[in-house]
From Swiss-Prot:
It is an enzyme of class 4 (lyase). This is 2-C-methyl-D-erythritol 2,4-cyclodiphosphate synthase. A divalent metal cation binds at residues 9, 11, 43. Binds 1 divalent metal cation per subunit. Gene3D superfamilies: 2-C-methyl-D-erythritol 2,4-cyclodiphosphate synthase. Keywords: Isoprene biosynthesis, Lyase, Metal-binding. The lineage of its organism: Bacteria, Bacillati, Bacillota, Bacilli, Bacillales. Its EC number is 4.6.1.12. Belongs to the IspF family. Homotrimer. It comes from the Bacteria. GO terms for molecular function: 2-C-methyl-D-erythritol 2,4-cyclodiphosphate synthase activity; metal ion binding. PROSITE patterns: ISPF.
Amino acid sequence: MFRIGQGFDVHQLTEGRPLIIGGIEIPYEKGLLGHSDADVLLHTVADACLGAAGEGDIGKHFPDTDPEFKDADSFKLLQHVWNIVKEKGYVLGNIDCTIIAQKPKMAPHIDAMRKRIAEGLEADVSQVNVKATTTEKLGFTGRAEGIAAQATVLIQKA
């Protein structure tokens, strides 16, 4: 049996925080605002996995009203999500992710992100694709006010 999940997330850029995307710290003058470390890509991946497994979303599992998740490492949240998926008897087929950001440039960090996501999903890096695009300076991402990400995941019974 195959199941497909889709994830989407957005975070505002702000001063005074590190920029962590896909589990990788990226040198930049701003970081993403959020209750956890605000890793927009790992949140998207986690949401896609939860959706595919029929287990809701990250807000259900890690509410931003719970102090336990204040400044949480999103990689640890992803590992927790993947354990839920595994307990239901699924393995990763593949995942395709898109980061939507005007800046900074993501290309130098894509390979490291793929490896980190593969690690979190206990998969081979060949099963993980990450790409980035801009919105040609249109909208909040185009004005560099925030960063968005989306992902589609395929899981299958082990």
